[in-house]
């Protein structure tokens, strides 16, 4: 699936890992924390080293000290990662209890501080909420807060803005940039969105069919790509120019004087008393 991949991330650096779906980006990220089932997954060659220590050959106890602690990960869909049966407070407290041994009383203040830092409004009130009560952007902010509670040295973000609308994407990217500078942490950012890469990355690694075909500084790669696949990838980036419309194009859909109302029901018999308009 991935073959002869070599890359490195410096302290405080953002490396964007880009490529089409199935190129091996997420598999690479999951391998950093040994989150792929082994067997069947194996690592015939190479190694992954964190501060010089092998992660591929580390025992489970060593990995527990790294996973979610010194290296944290944000996944693409927070509803899959957050437990729908537990409140935000319970899930965030579990992180501090497991990785930092904090008691609930001491943890609450740190949880509130972290939620406010990532832009969750009315944080004390939201602690009792369940994941389904949050918007998509709020859930992703909670995932970022959960990752940052342990003050990681490296944050892996796997397509963290894919399911969000453009305005929320911009907020999340700004937040990640600010937090990276504040904490001086490394960031491995996985995406297929080249416009995001331009905004966020210091360096870019391009993957194709499980191989890294090109690595370079962000500005250098966008201005002078060397590998044919990288050039095709950049050429596929939308220009933003709309397709010209023929002046005599027939009308496909029209709405005229449309109103939409929902009934307001009250009382024991749930009778309609008014409408929301």
Where are these regions (language model features)?
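Conserved ABC ATPase signature
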Residues: 129-134, 138
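A short, proline-enriched helix->beta-strand linker immediately N-terminal to the Walker B motif
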Residues: 149-153
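Conserved ABC transporter NBD signature motif
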Residues: 42-54
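A short, surface-exposed alpha-helical micro-motif characterized by mixed small hydrophobic
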Residues: 197-199
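Short catalytic/signature loops enriched in Gly
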Residues: 121-127, 215-276
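Conserved ABC ATPase "signature" region
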Residues: 106-125
């Amino acid at each position: 699936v991935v073959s002869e991949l070599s890359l490195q991330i410096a302290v405080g650096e953002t490396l964007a890992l880009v490529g089409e779906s199935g190129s091996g980006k997420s598999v690479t990220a999951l391998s950093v924390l040994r989150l792929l089932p082994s067997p069947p997954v194996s690592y015939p060659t190479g190694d992954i080293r964190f501060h010089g220590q092998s992660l591929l050959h580390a025992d489970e106890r060593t990995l527990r000290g790294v996973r979610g602690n010194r290296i944290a990960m944000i996944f693409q869909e927070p509803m899959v990662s957050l437990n729908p049966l537990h409140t935000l407070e319970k899930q965030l407290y579990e992180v501090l209890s497991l990785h930092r041994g904090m008691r609930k009383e001491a943890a609450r203040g740190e949880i509130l501080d972290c939620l406010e830092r990532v832009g969750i409004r009315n944080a004390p009130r939201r602690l009792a909420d369940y994941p389904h009560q949050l918007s998509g952007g709020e859930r992703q902010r909670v995932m970022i807060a959960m990752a940052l509670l342990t003050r990681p040295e490296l944050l892996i973000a796997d397509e963290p803005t894919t399911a969000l609308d453009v305005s929320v994407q911009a907020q999340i990217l700004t937040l990640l940039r600010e937090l990276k500078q504040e904490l001086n942490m490394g960031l491995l950012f996985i995406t297929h969105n080249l416009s995001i890469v331009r905004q966020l990355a210091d360096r870019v690694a391009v993957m194709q069919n499980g191989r890294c075909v090109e690595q370079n500084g962000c500005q250098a790669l966008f201005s002078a790509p060397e590998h044919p696949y990288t050039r095709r990838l950049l050429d596929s980036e939308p220009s933003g120019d709309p397709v010209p419309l023929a002046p005599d194009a027939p009308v496909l859909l029209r709405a005229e004087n449309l109103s939409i109302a929902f009934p307001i029901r009250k009382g024991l018999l749930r009778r309609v008393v008014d409408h929301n308009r």
